[in-house]
């Protein structure tokens, strides 16, 4: 939790960190990823058979080794908008018998050479947990139940035996399942209304949890601020054993929201993720409201927020049907750092957050035929995933604020936009970690600093300008390491992310 006091530009900024004041446990799943059958994410990204850099499974070894550096706990699959016309059965069994299908989300052809079993093998090699999305477009409940049976079934039943026939004896025990993706959107095949969706999602959830009560089901929300979110939460978060339910466990475990931010101007770009912070706050209140209005007892586990698509993305600059390959700048990297600060600050409410996407498609990691490129946005992800874990701790920031235009325009009406965007954690290893983004394009900011102890390790992400980019043949943005004695004030460089780390007393 970070509190804030607005100062005039003439007053001296300060940051006070209180390591003894733990606020909430950080779910490591806020560092989750997302792979969709879109552009070069799967084919030519994580799966590239015939490339000398690929292993015997066709998986790019350099991609796997790089992603291991991020310690990704969960990866969402296989979509995304792709899911609305995807039928999982097409992607299992002998590859020479798998059909190619028209792909309507991104207007391509799906060969189905990479499917459930290939993805699960890749997850095992990466050391991550899967999160599957169900087809709420052209799919059926029978198809969804069959997929869960194929993945998790242990009995002598048809789809569990089909998995065994395809070479996997033990169940995959996939825990996380989404009840559709963005089904409210006009771009979706079989777009639906909130009334239709809420009824369908609840009925599907009942059946799925009868088949496997250990599943964690994620409701399809919008951006957290819409009437869709209120209605679906109101009609799907109900007491266990209510008249509408025969389940012994809550049917809905998480509520999904999506948001992408971007601006061609630096300051609107780096402050835009604060819209996500407000969306999380509103969604959390809507969850509370649904529980209160529906009489859900406090003994029943409260659903959390699954922010399972987020990133910096301009869909005009990087069009989805053309692969959505962004060339990220330092400004974008700092925006990603602010995004991650938001998730740390809101760790009480956020149970998962999936950056979209893991490889090539609006991604921090790009592939060529000969290797990989770590984009500017890689470095904040790397530092946060490595260090910003454990507990969110109390921090107070006093500084000036940016007073210009924001994207969206309503951000400054509901959120402060400080020059120093901050979050802080206490790790299980006893180290305090403080992430500070100086969003100013032209001004170093010296701030008083309270709470540091002993020698402080300093990690800085920066470049020559906010337009610095790693896609021009050289790495213009990376991480530099230094130390600080932890005394007095610290000067945070202009347009930078600084991570300070020390052993708690």
Swiss-Prot record:
GO terms for biological process: arabinan catabolic process; L-arabinose metabolic process. GO terms for molecular function: alpha-L-arabinofuranosidase activity. InterPro entries: Alpha-L-AF_C, Glyco_hydro_b, Glycoside_hydrolase_SF. Gene3D superfamilies: Glycosidases, Golgi alpha-mannosidase II. Alpha-L-arabinofuranosidase involved in the degradation of arabinoxylan, a major component of plant hemicellulose. Acts only on small linear 1,5-alpha-linked L-arabinofuranosyl oligosaccharides. This is Probable alpha-L-arabinofuranosidase C. Keywords: Carbohydrate metabolism, Glycoprotein, Glycosidase, Hydrolase, Polysaccharide degradation, Secreted, Signal. Its main location: secreted. It catalyses: Hydrolysis of terminal non-reducing alpha-L-arabinofuranoside residues in alpha-L-arabinosides. Pathway: Glycan metabolism; L-arabinan degradation. Its EC number is 3.2.1.55. It holds the Pfam family Alpha-L-AF_C. Glycans are attached at residues 152, 269, 438. It comes from the Eukaryota. The keyword RNA-binding does not apply. It is found in: Secreted. Belongs to the glycosyl hydrolase 51 family. SUPFAM superfamilies: (Trans)glycosidases, Glycosyl hydrolase domain. One of its GO terms (cellular component) is extracellular region.
């Amino acid at each position: 939790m970070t509190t804030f006091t607005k100062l005039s530009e003439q007053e001296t900024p300060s940051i006070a960190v209180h390591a003894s004041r733990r606020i909430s446990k950080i779910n490591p799943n806020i560092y989750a990823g997302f792979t969709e059958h879109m552009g070069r994410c799967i084919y030519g990204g994580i799966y590239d058979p015939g490339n000398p850099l690929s292993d015997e499974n066709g998986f790019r070894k350099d991609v796997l080794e790089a992603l291991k550096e991020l310690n990704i706990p969960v990866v969402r699959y296989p979509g995304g908008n792709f899911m609305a016309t995807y039928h999982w059965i097409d992607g299992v069994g002998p590859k020479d018998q798998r059909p190619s299908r028209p792909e309507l989300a991104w207007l391509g052809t799906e060969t189905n050479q990479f499917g459930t079993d290939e993805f699960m093998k890749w997850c095992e090699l990466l050391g991550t947990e899967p999160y599957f999305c169900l087809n709420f477009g052209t799919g059926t409940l029978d198809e969804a139940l069959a997929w869960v049976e194929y993945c998790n079934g242990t009995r002598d039943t048809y789809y569990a035996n089909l998995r065994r026939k395809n070479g996997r004896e033990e169940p995959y025990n996939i825990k996380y399942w989404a009840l559709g993706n963005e089904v409210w959107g006009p771009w979706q095949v079989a777009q639906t209304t909130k009334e239709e969706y809420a009824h369908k999602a609840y009925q599907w959830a009942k059946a799925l949890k009868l088949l496997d009560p250990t599943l964690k089901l994620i409701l399809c929300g919008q951006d957290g601020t819409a009437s869709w979110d209120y209605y679906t939460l109101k009609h799907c978060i109900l007491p266990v054993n209510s008249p509408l339910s025969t389940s012994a466990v809550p049917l809905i475990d998480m509520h999904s929201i999506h948001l992408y931010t971007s601006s061609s101007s630096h300051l609107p770009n780096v402050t835009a993720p604060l819209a996500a912070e407000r969306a999380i706050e509103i969604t959390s209140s809507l969850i509370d409201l649904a529980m209160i209005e529906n009489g859900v007892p406090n003994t029943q586990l409260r659903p959390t927020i699954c922010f399972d698509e987020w990133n910096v993305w301009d869909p005009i600059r990087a069009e989805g049907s053309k692969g959505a390959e962004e060339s990220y700048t330092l400004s974008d990297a700092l925006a990603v750092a602010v995004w991650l600060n938001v998730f740390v600050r809101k760790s009480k409410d956020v149970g998962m957050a999936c950056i979209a996407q893991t490889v090539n498609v609006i991604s921090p990691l790009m592939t060529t035929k000969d290797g990989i490129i770590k984009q500017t946005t890689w470095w904040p992800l790397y530092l946060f995933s490595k260090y910003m874990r454990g507990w969110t701790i109390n921090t107070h920031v006093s500084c000036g604020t940016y007073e210009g235009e924001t994207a969206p325009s309503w951000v400054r009406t509901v959120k402060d936009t400080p020059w120093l965007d901050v979050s802080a954690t206490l790790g299980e290893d006893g180290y305090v970690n403080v992430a500070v983004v100086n969003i100013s394009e032209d001004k170093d900011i010296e701030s008083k600093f309270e709470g540091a102890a002993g020698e402080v390790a300093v990690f800085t992400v920066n470049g020559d300008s906010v337009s610095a980019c790693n896609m021009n043949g050289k790495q213009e943005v990376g991480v530099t390491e230094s130390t600080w004695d932890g005394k007095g004030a610290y000067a945070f460089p202009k347009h930078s992310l600084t991570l300070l780390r020390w052993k708690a007393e």
